[in-house]
């Protein structure tokens, strides 16, 4: 295990920059916002922890990358930011996301509300779910795990063709596992930053995926015909638990963060850290560090305390929308509270940040 501790000077420079104009820009921020972000380089800061590497298989150890400070983010000429003509985050479900239509709709509402709070100030719109066959993507049964997988490159091409004119980006989400090419076992997701499109799967976030109890394996191994999408009829969808919801929110916001121009964070424990495996992804916090928070604020223009309060409200609102759901049939109407148990510690952390902002 290794703890990555940067010096106060390094973190301060990464946050403020050496560019006098960017330093001046920082000094014009609200006093509370400066106070919170300055926690990044305070010796006894207890809000933003250093990064801890647990093994050589962790992302930073196995994927060396140059770090991105605020100045590099701000001056990146290839970075795309939302503008009045392209300001909406579109999310395209591929197939159903819940084991009934109503549960799928509730889950979509929860994700939409979370994204709107996290990217406070941007609009988030969910498009009507499309079937796998509508994308005309290639697919396969994984030879090792015997679960269904769809081809990321073909999904990205479908999303690019169907990207609305006012979209800042469009991201596809699915409960079906993904693969980028025949030689790969799987991939959690893939994005094209230049095109503003991405596709991400939550299939491996179910509680049983990595156990012998996993129910999503195709029972009888079979050769798939590229045009026969009937294999996806009644495909397995994991239960929407609090942990699965948390993992989904993490992945969605991390990847949209990339589309906004944020690279993998190497400064402090942060949502924007890379992850090589599910265990490492679970260790990542839901929050962004002060350096990435400044990047996000610069791209979107939100008030930080209002953003944090919106996130607390999302956690406290037990249900988004009036409809309920049932695990038995989509016609039965049962109240479905939002499963936010896994978010409770983060809620307390946000309240501590709000206290610093409003001091």
Curated annotation (Swiss-Prot):
<keyword id="KW-0862">Zinc</keyword>
<feature type="binding site">
    <location>
        <position position="264"/>
    </location>
    <ligand>
        <name>Zn(2+) 1</name>
    </ligand>
</feature>
<feature type="active site" description="Proton acceptor">
    <location>
        <position position="255"/>
    </location>
</feature>
<feature type="binding site">
    <location>
        <position position="289"/>
    </location>
    <ligand>
        <name>Zn(2+) 2</name>
    </ligand>
</feature>
<feature type="binding site">
    <location>
        <position position="254"/>
    </location>
    <ligand>
        <name>Zn(2+) 1</name>
    </ligand>
</feature>
<feature type="binding site">
    <location>
        <position position="258"/>
    </location>
    <ligand>
        <name>Zn(2+) 1</name>
    </ligand>
</feature>
<keyword id="KW-0482">Metalloprotease</keyword>
<keyword id="KW-0378">Hydrolase</keyword>
<keyword id="KW-0645">Protease</keyword>
<dbReference type="Pfam" id="PF07998">
    <property type="entry name" value="Peptidase_M54"/>
</dbReference>
<dbReference type="InterPro" id="IPR052009">
    <property type="entry name" value="Archaemetzincin"/>
</dbReference>
<comment type="similarity">
    <text>Belongs to the peptidase M54 family.</text>
</comment>
<protein>
    <recommendedName>
        <fullName>Archaemetzincin-2</fullName>
        <ecNumber>3.4.-.-</ecNumber>
    </recommendedName>
</protein>
<dbReference type="GO" id="GO:0006508">
    <property type="term" value="P:proteolysis"/>
</dbReference>
<dbReference type="GO" id="GO:0008237">
    <property type="term" value="F:metallopeptidase activity"/>
</dbReference>
<feature type="binding site">
    <location>
        <position position="292"/>
    </location>
    <ligand>
        <name>Zn(2+) 2</name>
    </ligand>
</feature>
<feature type="binding site">
    <location>
        <position position="270"/>
    </location>
    <ligand>
        <name>Zn(2+) 2</name>
    </ligand>
</feature>
<dbReference type="InterPro" id="IPR012962">
    <property type="entry name" value="Pept_M54_archaemetzincn"/>
</dbReference>
<comment type="function">
    <text>Probable zinc metalloprotease.</text>
</comment>
<dbReference type="GO" id="GO:0046872">
    <property type="term" value="F:metal ion binding"/>
</dbReference>
<dbReference type="InterPro" id="IPR024079">
    <property type="entry name" value="MetalloPept_cat_dom_sf"/>
</dbReference>
<feature type="binding site">
    <location>
        <position position="265"/>
    </location>
    <ligand>
        <name>Zn(2+) 2</name>
    </ligand>
</feature>
<keyword id="KW-0479">Metal-binding</keyword>
